[in-house]
C-alpha cells in the first residue's frame, strides 16, 4: 500500500498538476532553469510527462518534476535488472527516467522532497499507463555529485531517503542524435571529421535511419526504484 491514500489529494501538503498546455510547460521550464543547478531544460522527442508541484495551503507552485523514456543502455542498471540486449529493447518502455526534479528553497514543507517522489510513483505510474499503454515498473534517475559529496542536493540524499538504490555510476559517456553535418559524410572521412568536431571523436553509428554520436559526459550516480514487488520477473519476461 502506498504511503499516501490519494483518494483526496488535498489532505496532503502538496499536489501535482500535469503540464498539458504551453503556459504550464513554460512555467515548468522556468522552474527547472532557475532551481535545477546543473542541468537546464531541453525538449527531446520521447515519452515525457511533466508535473508542476503545488503547495496545498495556498496553491502556490513550489517545484517541478518529470519522467521520460529511460536511458537507452547503461551497464549498471541493465546488470541490476538482469537485462540482455534483446530483453532490454523489449521491456525498456516499462522503465521511466525521473529526468528532472527541483523545488523552490524555503517552501515551508518538511520532507517535501520524499513526498514529491511518492506522489510521482502514484501519479506517474497511473498516467504512464493511460498515456502510453505500458505498466510502469521501475524509475531511474542520475545525479551528478560534487567531488566530495558535500551538498545533499547533489549527492542524491532525497532519493536515498525515499529508499531508492544507488546501483553504481555511469562511465562518463552518453549517446545523442548526431547533427546532420556528422553523418552526411562517408566513413572514410571520419578521421578528418573527428579533428574538426570533437563530438565525432569517440564514435558515431546508425540505427535504421537515425544517426548517433557517443560523447563524453560527467560521471553520475545511478539510482533505481522498483514500483512493483514482481519487478524483476516483469522486466525479464
What is the meaning of each model-derived region?
Residues 1-3, 32, 150:
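Polar low-complexity intrinsically disordered regions
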Residues 1-22:
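Conserved N-terminal entry element of GNAT/NAT acetyltransferase domains
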Residues 10-11, 32, 202:
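Generic signal for short, ordered secondary-structure residues
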Residues 17-18, 22, 26-27, 47-49, ...:
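Acyl-donor binding region in acyl/amide transferases
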Residues 25-49:
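Short, basic/aromatic recognition patches
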Residues 33-36, 227, 231:
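Generic secondary-structure transition motif, activating predominantly at the C-termini of alpha-helices
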Residues 232-237:
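Flexible, glycine-/basic-rich loop-and-beta segments that form/coincide
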